[in-house]
Amino acid sequence: MNRTILHSDCNCFYASVELLHHPELRGKPVAVGGDPEARHGIVLTADYTAKRYGVKTGMALWQAKQVCPDITFLPPRMDLYLRFSRMAQEIYADYTDKREPYGIDESWLDVTDSATLKGDGFHIAQEISSRMKKELGITVSVGVSFNKIFAKLGSDYKKPDAITTMYEDEFQRKAWCLPVSDLLYVGNATNKKLYSMGIRTIGDLAKSDETLLVRKLGKMGSILWAFANGYDESPVKLENTSAPVKSVGNSTTTPRDMETDEDVKIVLYILAESVAARLRENGFRCRTVEISVRDKELFHFSKQVKLQNASNITKEIAEAGYRLYKDNYRLPADDKELKSSRTEFFQKPLRSIGIRGTDFVTDYFWEQLDIFMDPQAREKQMKMDETVDIIRKRFGFYSVQRGLMYRDRILSACDAKSDHTVHPHGYFG
């Protein structure tokens, strides 16, 4: 049975939401990105007026000011954006329960079974687009296709406020002429390798020798070749699908790149809080902690460590993850030798990071504690975590925060446990 997959992308999401609250700025260049005097201030999102001046996501605020002197900067309000994201999901839920968020502002929808009641994919996309404007005041670009890859490509094809089809009988005509970098999972590093092989377009990739691609790119070569040729059977995950719990983890792509060890520590603690809380909810402790790291060039690795004692304590899980990071990665900003070196350094600022606990035992599992561990201090940490759980359940996630989180409100503005979405580039889970 042929599938009908939509990919809905909220246009300039942060900026669009802010303009609803600042109507006086409509038609003027606006960017969301914090304090322009801040050391790490970057553009998180620019509206289309600012983009016409050359302002781009990820650009330093001072650079944005140079190319667009009249730009207005607004500080990010992640709680507001998450609320709008949830309202968008409520609209999508009227059409299907097969919804897979891809970050805060994008989602795949499998509407195959909705055709009888709601009409074909293009008609559903029109309805969703209309409702988003009327009910939320924002626009979306929607791709309509027979798989997730080309649905995503369709939503990127034309912006803003557009619907693009990439059906099975037209994807070669529409997609193959596009730059290969437009294909999901082709980052800068992969694009450079493909360019060195003479591959410029998605069509070039589709017509390439799969064996040669595997030789140059490993298994990713075969995956990208399949994507370019329209071979993607990956399902849109059913909402609230549950399976036997074998691991508990969270990952995120941060609003700006992580450039220092402290940046990484903040994000790891946020994610570890979610992992530990979910372990406690399910009555588990983990004996192994694993981290996954991806830098701005999309190079990635995973490392794991066995804990001395099984744990669902936030601090123990976070510190185990942080030690793994410190033992296996150095950021340029924290490397004194690198600062004085003129050579290219292999490791770059980080784009995303994840942490998970595996190898479970139940809360009732007995084990002998390490003789060097202070049982009273550990008991204190357990009680503190349990108290935080109770407070947050009653008054909300932001009712109690670690002091560490106040060092960078952009990086820390995330409720990983409640949000719990798949973030780019988390396509393969």
Go through each PLM region and give its residues.
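A short glycine-rich, hydrophobically flanked beta-strand micro-motif that places a catalytic Asp/Glu
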Residues: 140, 144, 287-290, 353
